[in-house]
Curated annotation (Swiss-Prot):
<dbReference type="InterPro" id="IPR041736">
    <property type="entry name" value="4OHPhenylPyrv_dOase_N"/>
</dbReference>
<feature type="domain" description="VOC 2">
    <location>
        <begin position="160"/>
        <end position="328"/>
    </location>
</feature>
<keyword id="KW-0408">Iron</keyword>
<keyword id="KW-0991">Intellectual disability</keyword>
<feature type="binding site">
    <location>
        <position position="258"/>
    </location>
    <ligand>
        <name>Fe cation</name>
    </ligand>
</feature>
<dbReference type="GO" id="GO:0005759">
    <property type="term" value="C:mitochondrial matrix"/>
</dbReference>
<dbReference type="InterPro" id="IPR037523">
    <property type="entry name" value="VOC"/>
</dbReference>
<feature type="domain" description="VOC 1">
    <location>
        <begin position="7"/>
        <end position="135"/>
    </location>
</feature>
<protein>
    <recommendedName>
        <fullName>4-hydroxyphenylpyruvate dioxygenase-like protein</fullName>
        <ecNumber>1.13.11.46</ecNumber>
    </recommendedName>
</protein>
<comment type="function">
    <text>Iron-dependent dioxygenase that catalyzes the conversion of 4-hydroxyphenylpyruvate (4-HPPA) to 4-hydroxymandelate (4-HMA) in the mitochondria, one of the steps in the biosynthesis of coenzyme Q10 from tyrosine.</text>
</comment>
<feature type="binding site">
    <location>
        <position position="163"/>
    </location>
    <ligand>
        <name>Fe cation</name>
    </ligand>
</feature>
<dbReference type="InterPro" id="IPR041735">
    <property type="entry name" value="4OHPhenylPyrv_dOase_C"/>
</dbReference>
<keyword id="KW-0496">Mitochondrion</keyword>
<keyword id="KW-0560">Oxidoreductase</keyword>
<feature type="binding site">
    <location>
        <position position="339"/>
    </location>
    <ligand>
        <name>Fe cation</name>
    </ligand>
</feature>
<dbReference type="GO" id="GO:0009072">
    <property type="term" value="P:aromatic amino acid metabolic process"/>
</dbReference>
<keyword id="KW-0523">Neurodegeneration</keyword>
Length: 371
């Protein structure tokens, strides 16, 4: 591995001026302003909930936004993952030697609280770039060059980023897996026993409906980096596009489809987001009527009617449970969305929940196409 990722610093978004992403993250999801910067046509605002940090780059300028790269993309998007590394300069040289494109070579930024060095590397996942950040000893609340923003404590619905899911073009997952392994030290994380890394977890949606391939990757032991999930469509759909294909079409290529945000109390968080005006995908109508589902929900210590009312999915086995709920898209282009996830001992991703998400997004997509 050339540049092992040690920690996820933040996820960056690029949106046009006036797009409400930053406002909605605060109003609907309980994120609080952390630091800001306005210069050269850019308004950069970092927002935080627990250890989860989103950097919203709004507008456009003649230069590049600090700690990132302007993708000049046609639609709003999550465009950058920023990782802490031990030595940004050395990491950049090693990645360049592997053939990686480095559109922003190492830059050192300093303010009264200390200094940081960063470089930006292109990835094979469409417009998604990766920032390699070295900030040991920096004392400020975010990064050099940003002005701290005072804010009241948030509701604490989200404590950290649990996983990141990339929507990929068909057949590209093995290439992406090797790239993240060779460049950042990620390794294959099986989602099912005996899983072939080249094939991942394959799930069919039924005759004429295609299916989904998921490949999970985890960073090296001891790092504080979310799981990375690669999602691609399987051939076989003969009717409408599935949600991965729709993402690729509407996003104009592969990219970050959703971020899973860990919550210590998914019932409370979902209720709070819904009360604030956030919208969630409705699970398939028969989800809560599956044989044994009510018993499983009660075994996890929850009330079936509460989960059903809020659209929370639950999967588990041998006393370990996984609860998930998915928002509608945060962009009018119907691309990027968020997931709230609570783990009660479970470390993977419930296949039952994955199938239910697939079906619920398909149903939502069908309604959108018919509207």
């Amino acid at each position: 591995m050339a540049a092992p990722a040690l920690r996820l610093c933040h996820i960056a978004f690029h949106v046009p001026a006036g797009q409400p992403l930053a406002r909605n993250l605060q109003r609907l999801f309980g994120f609080q302003p952390l630091a800001s910067r306005e210069v050269d046509g850019w308004r950069q605002l970092a927002l935080r909930s627990g250890d989860a940090v989103f950097l919203v780059n709004e507008g456009a300028g003649s230069g590049e936004p600090l700690y990132g790269l302007d993708p000049r993309h046609a639609v709003p998007s999550a465009t950058n993952l920023c990782f802490d590394v031990a030595d940004a300069g050395a990491a950049t040289r090693e990645l360049a030697a592997l053939g990686c494109s480095v559109p922003v070579p190492p830059v050192r930024v300093r303010d009264a609280q200390g200094a940081a060095t960063y470089a930006v590397v292109s990835s094979p996942a469409g417009i998604l770039s990766l920032t390699l950040l070295e900030r040991a000893g920096y004392r400020g609340p975010f990064l050099p060059g940003f002005r701290p923003v005072s804010s009241a404590p948030g509701p604490g619905w989200v404590s950290r980023v649990d996983h990141l899911t990339l929507a990929c073009t068909p057949g590209s997952s093995p290439t992406l897996l090797r790239w993240f392994h060779d460049c950042l030290g990620f390794c294959h994380l099986p989602l099912s026993p005996g899983e072939d890394p080249e094939l991942g977890l394959e799930m069919t949606a039924g005759f004429g409906l295609g299916g989904l391939r998921l490949t999970a990757l985890q960073a090296q032991p001891g790092s504080i980096v979310p799981t990375l999930v690669l999602a691609e469509s399987l051939p076989g759909a003969t009717t409408r596009q599935d949600q991965v294909e729709q993402f690729l079409a509407r996003h104009k290529g592969p990219g970050l489809q959703h971020v899973g945000l860990y919550t210590p109390n998914i019932v409370e968080a979902t209720e709070g987001v819904a009360t604030a005006g956030g919208q969630f995908l409705a699970p398939p109508g028969a989800y809560y009527q599956q044989p044994g589902k009510e018993r499983q929900i009660r075994a996890a210590g929850h009330e079936p009617h509460l989960l059903a009312r809020q659209g929370i999915l639950l999967d588990g086995d041998k006393g370990k449970f996984l609860l998930q709920v998915f928002t509608k898209s945060l962009f009018t282009e119907d691309t990027f969305f968020l997931e709230l996830i609570q783990r009660q001992g479970a470390t993977g991703f419930g296949q039952g929940n994955i199938r239910a998400l697939w079906q619920s997004v398909q149903e939502q997509s069908a309604r959108s196409q018919e509207a």
